[in-house]
Amino acid sequence: DMAPDFKSTTQDGAALTLADLKGQRTILYFYPKDNTSGCTLEAKSLRDGRAELARMGFRIIGVSPDSEKSHRNFCAKHDLNFTLLADTDHSVCEAYGVWAEKSMYGRKYMGVLRTTFVIDAEGRIEKVFTKVDTANHYRQILDAYK
Protein backbone atom coordinates (compact mmCIF):
# COMPACT_ATOMS: atom_id res chain seq x y z
CA ASP A 1 0.00 0.00 0.00
CA MET A 2 1.11 3.54 -0.65
CA ALA A 3 1.86 5.58 2.46
CA PRO A 4 -0.74 8.29 3.11
CA ASP A 5 0.36 11.75 2.02
CA PHE A 6 0.90 14.37 4.72
CA LYS A 7 2.15 17.88 5.28
CA SER A 8 3.65 18.78 8.62
CA THR A 9 6.33 20.88 10.30
CA THR A 10 9.66 19.78 11.79
CA GLN A 11 11.02 20.86 15.17
CA ASP A 12 12.90 23.63 13.28
CA GLY A 13 9.79 24.97 11.55
CA ALA A 14 10.51 23.48 8.12
CA ALA A 15 7.64 22.05 6.07
CA LEU A 16 7.83 18.32 5.33
CA THR A 17 5.62 16.18 3.07
CA LEU A 18 5.59 12.56 2.00
CA ALA A 19 7.06 13.62 -1.37
CA ASP A 20 10.14 14.96 0.47
CA LEU A 21 10.86 11.42 1.68
CA LYS A 22 11.02 9.86 -1.80
CA GLY A 23 14.31 8.25 -2.72
CA GLN A 24 15.17 6.95 0.74
CA ARG A 25 13.65 4.43 3.13
CA THR A 26 12.07 6.12 6.11
CA ILE A 27 11.27 4.91 9.60
CA LEU A 28 8.18 7.00 10.44
CA TYR A 29 7.48 6.38 14.10
CA PHE A 30 4.46 7.70 15.98
CA TYR A 31 4.68 8.19 19.74
CA PRO A 32 2.34 9.75 22.32
CA LYS A 33 4.34 12.48 24.09
CA ASP A 34 7.78 14.09 24.43
CA ASN A 35 9.68 13.46 27.67
CA THR A 36 7.49 10.65 28.98
CA SER A 37 9.18 7.42 30.05
CA GLY A 38 8.33 5.07 27.17
CA CYS A 39 8.67 7.74 24.50
CA THR A 40 12.07 8.79 25.83
CA LEU A 41 13.31 5.17 25.87
CA GLU A 42 12.12 4.70 22.28
CA ALA A 43 13.75 7.94 21.08
CA LYS A 44 17.05 7.07 22.79
CA SER A 45 17.03 3.58 21.23
CA LEU A 46 16.58 5.09 17.75
CA ARG A 47 19.22 7.74 18.51
CA ASP A 48 21.71 5.05 19.54
CA GLY A 49 20.92 2.93 16.49
CA ARG A 50 20.77 5.76 13.97
CA ALA A 51 24.24 5.21 12.46
CA GLU A 52 23.59 1.50 11.94
CA LEU A 53 20.13 2.17 10.51
CA ALA A 54 21.58 4.88 8.21
CA ARG A 55 24.13 2.36 6.88
CA MET A 56 21.14 0.21 5.88
CA GLY A 57 19.62 3.19 4.06
CA PHE A 58 17.06 4.31 6.65
CA ARG A 59 16.26 7.81 7.82
CA ILE A 60 14.28 8.32 11.06
CA ILE A 61 11.35 10.68 11.55
CA GLY A 62 9.33 10.80 14.77
CA VAL A 63 5.76 12.12 14.96
CA SER A 64 3.75 13.25 17.99
CA PRO A 65 1.14 15.94 18.70
CA ASP A 66 3.72 18.03 20.63
CA SER A 67 4.71 21.54 19.50
CA GLU A 68 7.90 22.50 17.65
CA LYS A 69 9.22 24.04 20.89
CA SER A 70 8.51 20.87 22.87
CA HIS A 71 10.31 18.84 20.17
CA ARG A 72 13.34 21.17 20.21
CA ASN A 73 13.59 20.78 24.00
CA PHE A 74 13.17 16.98 23.74
CA CYS A 75 15.94 16.80 21.10
CA ALA A 76 18.29 19.02 23.13
CA LYS A 77 17.69 17.16 26.39
CA HIS A 78 18.39 13.72 24.88
CA ASP A 79 20.77 14.59 22.00
CA LEU A 80 18.28 13.30 19.44
CA ASN A 81 19.84 13.26 15.99
CA PHE A 82 16.77 12.98 13.77
CA THR A 83 13.70 14.91 12.65
CA LEU A 84 10.53 15.19 14.73
CA LEU A 85 7.22 16.35 13.26
CA ALA A 86 4.97 18.64 15.30
CA ASP A 87 1.60 17.09 14.44
CA THR A 88 -0.32 19.50 16.68
CA ASP A 89 -3.61 19.02 14.78
CA HIS A 90 -2.97 15.22 14.70
CA SER A 91 -3.68 15.17 10.94
CA VAL A 92 -0.64 12.96 10.23
CA CYS A 93 -1.63 10.58 13.05
CA GLU A 94 -5.17 10.43 11.64
CA ALA A 95 -3.92 9.79 8.08
CA TYR A 96 -1.92 6.79 9.36
CA GLY A 97 -4.76 5.51 11.56
CA VAL A 98 -2.90 5.92 14.86
CA TRP A 99 -5.09 8.63 16.45
CA ALA A 100 -7.61 6.66 18.47
CA GLU A 101 -9.50 6.34 21.72
CA LYS A 102 -7.28 5.11 24.53
CA SER A 103 -7.99 4.33 28.14
CA MET A 104 -5.90 4.95 31.25
CA TYR A 105 -7.08 4.37 34.82
CA GLY A 106 -10.62 4.01 33.49
CA ARG A 107 -10.53 7.39 31.75
CA LYS A 108 -11.10 7.44 27.99
CA TYR A 109 -9.28 9.99 25.83
CA MET A 110 -7.97 10.45 22.29
CA GLY A 111 -4.29 9.80 21.78
CA VAL A 112 -1.53 8.26 19.69
CA LEU A 113 -1.22 4.48 19.33
CA ARG A 114 2.54 3.86 19.42
CA THR A 115 3.23 2.53 15.92
CA THR A 116 6.15 2.52 13.48
CA PHE A 117 5.84 2.46 9.70
CA VAL A 118 8.76 1.69 7.39
CA ILE A 119 8.22 3.45 4.06
CA ASP A 120 10.26 2.42 1.02
CA ALA A 121 12.02 4.81 -1.37
CA GLU A 122 8.93 4.89 -3.63
CA GLY A 123 6.53 5.81 -0.82
CA ARG A 124 5.03 2.38 -0.16
CA ILE A 125 4.52 0.99 3.34
CA GLU A 126 7.00 -1.86 3.69
CA LYS A 127 6.52 -2.86 7.35
CA VAL A 128 4.38 -1.86 10.32
CA PHE A 129 5.33 -2.37 13.98
CA THR A 130 2.37 -2.16 16.36
CA LYS A 131 4.00 -3.96 19.30
CA VAL A 132 6.90 -1.59 19.83
CA ASP A 133 9.67 -2.63 22.23
CA THR A 134 10.50 0.93 23.33
CA ALA A 135 13.88 0.28 24.96
CA ASN A 136 15.12 -1.86 22.03
CA HIS A 137 13.19 -0.43 19.11
CA TYR A 138 16.12 0.07 16.76
CA ARG A 139 17.14 -3.59 17.26
CA GLN A 140 13.53 -4.64 16.65
CA ILE A 141 13.67 -2.86 13.27
CA LEU A 142 17.12 -4.24 12.39
CA ASP A 143 16.05 -7.78 13.28
CA ALA A 144 13.06 -7.50 10.92
CA TYR A 145 15.48 -6.80 8.05
CA LYS A 146 18.02 -9.54 8.73
Describe the residue ranges of each PLM region.
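Chalcogenol-based redox active-site neighborhoods
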Residues: 1-146
